[in-house]
Amino acid sequence: MTMFSLRAAAAQIPGASVTGDDSVRFERVSTDSRSAGPGDLFIAIKGDRFDAHDFLPQVAERNVAAVLVARTPENWSVPAIRVADTREALGALARGWRRQFDLPLVAVTGSNGKTTVKEMIASIFAAAVGADARLATAGNFNNDIGLPLTLFRLHAAHRLAVVELGMNHPGETEQLAKLAGPTVAVVNNAQREHQEFMATVEAVALEHASVIHALSPEGTAVFPADDAYASIWRVAATGNRIIDFALNNAERTTEAAVQGTFDDKRLSIDTPQGHLDVTLQVLGNHNAHNALAATSAALAAGVSLDAIQRGLESFGAVKGRLQVKQAALGSLAGATVIDDTYNANPDSMRAAIDVLASRESPRVLVMGDMGEVGDNGPAFHREIGAYAKERGIDALYAMGDASRDACTAYGAGAHHVADVGALVAQLQQAGFGAAATLLVKGSRFMQMERVVDAVTSPQPNAAGSTPAAH
């Protein structure tokens, strides 16, 4: 699909100028010098460890249509858009491209569960219009490079779209939301994330409100009615349609447009359009909450209840997010392994422990350090150790310096280990057997998937001897 001419592309970017033939048109946008090719506009991004301008001679040899750069080598002949900052230009161009398309676009943010909610919505949209007619963020391409590249994938055949907005510093959500131009803004929750950079949970909630502020007057805001910070999002949505949601139980009922009750994997949903009974394939109350968020967003985008049900029931766990696997190593063979290794913060750790607590004994928590917790690190880790003990978890195995505090708070039955090899060896020696359930979780830098890989392989592997990353 032909995108912009260089003249039209430069018009989307403040301060841009064109050298060479400005009538040249491009078909795709690339930021990877290794895969750029004919028909591409190559955008040279400067990163922390590289500068793609250094690879422009190789890019020229790949016969790209044009480049977008801050500078060019001497004797450069490939048509070019010149800008002061290529990263900002990438976003401006993506914003211009997104505005070529009039379709429902859902933007998802929140402290925990946003990738799962995004994937649930993508599954619902695929059920509604087919996978080829819906655009969805691939993986977690949710930052100021990943989101523009996602938006550049929009084409005329798309009828629905869902994108994920990531954040770890103040102001990022506002920037990304302006690029996305959402018609539906989803805030899944506000919890203790990125506390090294976001001083309070209220600051997190206000940051997430930026996606609602990016709505046009015709847009719809989606958020949990029972969240402590719902009032912030309700004020942000003044003048917009609101579809709020709540997961209720015998102890607590919250009035909301979309309400659900959950028992094991059976989710009963009441909506303004009617009732749904959905059998989820994923674990935990928090995934029932995620399903209500996805349902609300889909309703806002005009999707039928039938497609919502089909999409939710066909949805499986996202990699590294409460994936159920089976141990195969030694005495652990046959044990259930819950792989929740993608990332961790105090609230997602507590939610995962709740899932573990619902299983039969022996229940084993295998945890790594939680990152980006700032000065609250010791207190947060002690909280998790104490919570695991309170919820009846039978044993705690921890790796990483900060997790020593979790072991101290847990008390008897806690084991702190130096590396993955020692951890796996101790798990085998403990003799938990096939009836056990192991929950493995930690922040991304801990690479706790190495533990999962080790225990789900019938033979010891190289991951078992790799020291923990710090």
Task: Show the residue positions of the predicted features.
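Active-site regions of enzymes building and remodeling cell-envelope glycoconjugates
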Residues: 77-86, 239-246, 256-259, 410-418
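ATP-dependent carboxylate-amine ligase
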Residues: 1-18, 36-41, 47, 51-54, ...
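Non-catalytic positions within long, well-ordered alpha-helices that form the structural scaffold/packing
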Residues: 56, 60-61, 177-178, 389
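Residue-level signal for inorganic ion chemistry
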Residues: 9, 40, 59, 93, ...
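Phosphate-binding loop of NTP-binding sites
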Residues: 76, 89-225, 229-238, 433-434, ...
